């Protein structure tokens, strides 16, 4: 692997540029074939949180998918998920059902962490991921 392959690439889809400019973080960083994705939350294009854990989970996974596609990968390339939940015990089953829609097989490693709050009071879940681009191809 050459030094050029190890150059860090910032991944910030156009709709997230305001977050990069305001809060000074990237949605993801890619080095070689590895992509580290910042926590994705259940907000829509207008930054409005979804109504419940199911809607927020779908929105978070859709955002994750979009960032990975921007980085040249897909959800199939995810090797690790770390999720943060404001009601882990009460909502992990509903979250898990949504997760399984996006990862129907070749399950990534997954750690679920209970937290007292996320960046907005209405948020219930945040999803972080690590992906290895190309690893999900059959």
Short names for language-model regions:
Residues 1-62, 66-79, 85-138:
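N-terminal presequence-like segments and the immediate start of the first folded domain
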